[in-house]
Amino acid sequence: MQHDASSLPRLILASSSRYRRELLERLRAPFDVVTPEVDETPLPGETPSATALRLAAAKARAAAERVRAPHGALVIGSDQVATFDGLQIGKPGTHERALAQLQAMRGRDVEFHSALCLYDSRCGQTQIEDVVTRVRFRTLTDVELDAYLRAETPYDVAGSAKSEGLGIALLDAIDSDDPTALVGLPLIALTRMLRAAGYPLFDAPASAADGANGQ
């Protein structure tokens, strides 16, 4: 059964990340990108999972407020927080902090909480899930870590390693139920949520190449 695009809810990705955009394009459904403005500072005493879930929901709702859609919108929000030894590892922001993160994590097991939220503006319903990925980092030298950072500048990602790029060379093992979660957009969970929201996955009205056009 072919669906009329004009009657479907608008699919929105609440993220400026090109990696999340590339992942969503795999579903071959049209979507638009809206960059949310959300303070990503963890709350005092907040667990890594709680931080990721709260921010994913906040991003989805912030983007939804900026969207006009006659037939409603399904807004995808996501956030990722890394943790080891009970400490949250966020986005480093600078080369120095990124190097310190990688030095602390080498040879260690680290958990990445990839939170996903699907907000349905038609009814106000929210589906939300935290997909956990366990990663073991290789024991690399300071020279190797510094060279990686200068090559890929991963200062805007939790844990200072882009597994979708050269950062895969920092890792010794990955344990996850969803291979896309570590990149930041768990597609297995997302497709489950979209189906629950009644969005057609196998007869989408247009290819992803027609989407991602901004607001």
UniProtKB/Swiss-Prot annotation:
This enzyme's EC code(s): 3.6.1.-
Keyword flag Hydrolase: yes
GO biological process per UniProt: nucleotide metabolic process
Residues of the signal peptide: none
Top enzyme category: hydrolase
UniProt cofactor(s): a divalent metal cation
Reactions catalysed according to its record: N(7)-methyl-GTP + H2O = N(7)-methyl-GMP + diphosphate + H(+)
Positions marked as site (Important for substrate specificity): 19, 80, 164
UniProt keyword annotations, A-Z: Cytoplasm, Hydrolase, Nucleotide metabolism
GO molecular function list: nucleoside triphosphate diphosphatase activity
Gene Ontology terms: cellular component: cytoplasm
Active site per the UniProt annotation: 79 (proton acceptor)
Pfam families in the record: Maf (PF02545)
Compartment(s): Cytoplasm
Residue intervals passing through the bilayer: none
Coarse class of the protein's main subcellular location: cytoplasm
Assigned protein family: Belongs to the Maf family. YceF subfamily.
Role summary: Nucleoside triphosphate pyrophosphatase that hydrolyzes 7-methyl-GTP (m(7)GTP). May have a dual role in cell division arrest and in preventing the incorporation of modified nucleotides into cellular nucleic acids.
PANTHER family: BIFUNCTIONAL DTTP/UTP PYROPHOSPHATASE/METHYLTRANSFERASE PROTEIN-RELATED, BIFUNCTIONAL DTTP_UTP PYROPHOSPHATASE_METHYLTRANSFERASE PROTEIN-RELATED
Protein name (record): 7-methyl-GTP pyrophosphatase
Annotated source species: Burkholderia thailandensis (strain ATCC 700388 / DSM 13276 / CCUG 48851 / CIP 106301 / E264)
